Amino acid sequence: MTKVLFICHGNICRSPMAEFVMKDLVAKAGLSDKFEIASAATSTEEIGNPVYPPARRKLAEHGISCEGKTARQMTRRDYETYDYLIAMDHNNLRNMARFVGLSLIH
């Protein structure tokens, strides 16, 4: 199973949108049993909050539900568990590297 984690600052806009779009694409391809897809934040600012309403609406326009998703912060265990950690921008990548104690991430 391939494990993918999308990461942004607060885990209420970009990374959950990426998570649910990817889940939708994988499901439509009949590959849901081959992937584990999630998202997380580098900060603590939004922990426990739902997906930002405009992001939720945009997903819904495409028939994609993100119901029940709440923001969470990434953990060191995520780095050890997921095959791919995909940062939404360079700042997220830098914060992720600092968070998990790495000086270089590819």
Q: Where are the regions a protein language model picked out?
A:
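Conserved active-site segments centered on acidic
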Residues: 1-82
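Short amphipathic alpha-helical segments
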Residues: 18-20, 97-101
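Alpha-helix capping/helix-boundary segments
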Residues: 92-93
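Conserved small/polar residues in nucleotide/adenosyl-binding loops
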Residues: 105-106
